[in-house]
Amino acid sequence: MDDPSFLTGRSTFAKRRRARRMNVCKCGAIMHNNKDCKSSSISSHKLDRLRFVKEGRVALTGETPVYRTWVKWVETEYHIYIVETSDDED
């Protein structure tokens, strides 16, 4: 991910190439990119994972760090909008 030039395209080819490079499945899974994936929607568990990534994630030893552009791309591609609510409403 040293070369961010592949993030700029909006064509179908660019989206497929981006998904291949980032290992993002059509179902929104972060860790796999299966062509025959049978999942169709993003679960609340995956939304929680994305929220955790967005709020801050520490890369452990031997782990690939998660970049903000990647999180933004996943949110945009799968129409995920995390609404911040305050718990102080009375």
Swiss-Prot record:
GO BP, one annotated term: symbiont-mediated suppression of host innate immune response
Annotated segments matching region Basic: 15-18
Superkingdom of source: Viruses
One GO MF term: RNA binding
One Pfam family, short name: Viral_NABP
Keyword vocabulary terms for this entry: Host-virus interaction, Inhibition of host innate immune response by virus, RNA-binding, Suppressor of RNA silencing, Viral immunoevasion
Functional description taken from the UniProt entry: Suppressor of viral-induced RNA silencing. The potential mechanism of action is based on sequestering siRNAs.
Family the UniProt entry places it in: Belongs to the carlaviruses nucleic acid-binding protein family.
Full protein name: RNA silencing suppressor
Organism: Grapevine virus A (isolate Is 151)
